[in-house]
Amino acid sequence: MFKPEEIVKVEIITLARFRDTLLTYLHEMGVAQLDEVPIEGIQRDTPNEFYRKATSYSITLSRLIDTVKHYLPPRKGGIKEFIFPEEKKKRKYKYRGIEELIKDVEKFLGEAEPKIREVESEVSRLNNEISALKDSLNALELLSSLNIEIENLRGRSFLSVEVGLVDREKVENLIKELEEIAEGRVFTLRKDLAAKSLLVVVSLRKDSGKVISLLAKYGFEKIEIPEGEGLPKDLIPKYIERIKGKEKELEDVKLKGREIAEKYYEDLVFYKELMDNEREKSNFLSYLVRTEMTFGLLAWVPKKDVEKVVEGVKRITNGIAYIEVREPSEEEIENVPVKLKNPEFISHFEMLTEMYGVPKYNEIDPTPILAFTYSFFFGFMLTDFVYGLLLGVISALLVKGHSKLKDGTWKFAKIMLWASAFTMVLGILFGSYCGNLLDMAGVKVPRLLDTMSEALTVLVMALAIGLGHLFTGYILGFIVNWKNGDKRAAILEQLPWVFIIIGITLFALSSKLGIPQIAFKAVFGVGLALFVVGEIVNNKGMAVLLTISDFFGFIGNWLSYARLMALALATSGIALVINIIANMVWGLKIGPIPLGILIGIVILIGGHIFSTAINALGAFVHALRLHYVEFFGTFYSGEGRKFEPFAAKREVSELEIES
């Protein structure tokens, strides 16, 4: 706690024939972060043909999965599925090397891919045919108004026939121009249909070029003449039957597709996951160095996992390996990847720390402090027992439902579980149960403080809490800089604010505790003097401007904690409005029916659920902001290098390595 996981540097050199199995072992363990071996002028490893095939097959499998998904029945969804997701079953695969894995994938694809592609091709063909038939049916419905046999609407050897739609207001001018350019050798038939006119143009074949150009000028929408003979109205039933036949054929093909999808979908997902992990492994090959017979790698490993890693390497290589384990040197400290280490009950708060950035290896991990203060700030801003209870119930359900997955939702729900506990406690202290609902119902509620009527007191509390929060940050910054040997920064950047905050605190308490003025003035003066000296040393010529800017920056950061009061007041205010609206309609009756009670209950339930959601969102964001901007700004850079293990991502597969 407060310190990241101890990390050591592990260097391994062994025979090239062990490369694939050793990489797979490290990948499955998922406890080592691979780094590029820092040796210039030596040959780097590259993916061989099997790794390249893995990349290609990963893409192929992904496309096949997308195809068969369309034929599977829709998955269960909804709130229940979100809260209690089904755990995916894992299937074991005996890993005998990438060559054998590629052979297994090729064998599977050789069986499954042709069947899937065949169904895909058939579905595409039938969809195109149905679409074409529907277009023809639409054309027949338009042409039926002409009452002309369909064969007469097709061109002849000496005649050109164009049938289509044109804007109704343009049709007169179009007909005139047609007669002019064809010198009277043209026949037109017109049928007005709302805003469009259906037009048949018959001309000599030799004039067709000029006719078509003119039709295009007027925005003529050509209608393709369907197959068949006879009147359009007589052909329509035949086309409807043809469409039904094709749709029945399509359903049969889709049914076949569903059978294939149900047979192969899980296998496709399984093999894709295997290929994805091989693909990821290939991305790290350039980190390795090699000769004709050997290869070497460099890894960062948590100290607690080193023994397990070394034992595994020796087992896989039959002891034919050079392994060096050592602590990072002073020069390497900046480059050491950081893995946060906290007790299980607060480890989920690491997610919030990592969102900002991890500490450097020689810095303090703020997660233990953030776990308490974030939850407290959230509770202070939401500050209602019922809201906290509602949030707690939802969070508890999500924690239970995602407990086996240990995913981001599970971590977030555990954070909200803490936050809801603080919200309920502070809700009791402030006597807030859906705002003042119990007070309006005539129930006497005990409370230490009323947010609405004692807003000024709540503001003073918020500023006092903020001062304490900033003080903690400056103390931590002082400790980190002093410990890391940067004593000047500790004395000139953190210590001045420590004295200034103590001085402000003594001044605030002086009237109650009888502290002499000279005491707080002396402490404040020392802090101010150190602050000015620090500004002069650090900023030289810009010291005057930056002294004013930085001092008022501190004041701004301090006053920013007033948002604790503002959001607590907003929560109470919104709840009060909901309660007043419900109270206004409560007595409404229509005859003997107490309609107002029903409406009032709906307003109370819906309104307070909305209030919980909107105010919880505000509390979440602003509690984060107070840490990321105000608190972390006092001591924490978040510029560390996050530990990113070389780890397999497995949801449906499990590897058994044959060494």
Curated annotation (Swiss-Prot):
Belongs to the V-ATPase 116 kDa subunit family. Disulfide bonds: none annotated. Its main location: membrane. It is a multi-pass membrane protein. Keywords: Cell membrane, Hydrogen ion transport, Ion transport, Membrane, Transmembrane, Transmembrane helix, Transport. It is found in: Cell membrane. It holds the Pfam family V_ATPase_I. Component of the A-type ATP synthase that produces ATP from ADP in the presence of a proton gradient across the membrane. GO terms for cellular component: plasma membrane; proton-transporting V-type ATPase, V0 domain; vacuolar proton-transporting V-type ATPase complex. This is A-type ATP synthase subunit I. One of its GO terms (molecular function) is proton-transporting ATPase activity, rotational mechanism. One of its GO terms (biological process) is vacuolar acidification. It comes from Pyrococcus abyssi (strain GE5 / Orsay). Has multiple subunits with at least A(3), B(3), C, D, E, F, H, I and proteolipid K(x). The keyword tRNA processing does not apply. InterPro entries: V-ATPase_116kDa_su. It comes from the Archaea. The lineage of its organism: Archaea, Methanobacteriati, Methanobacteriota, Thermococci, Thermococcales.
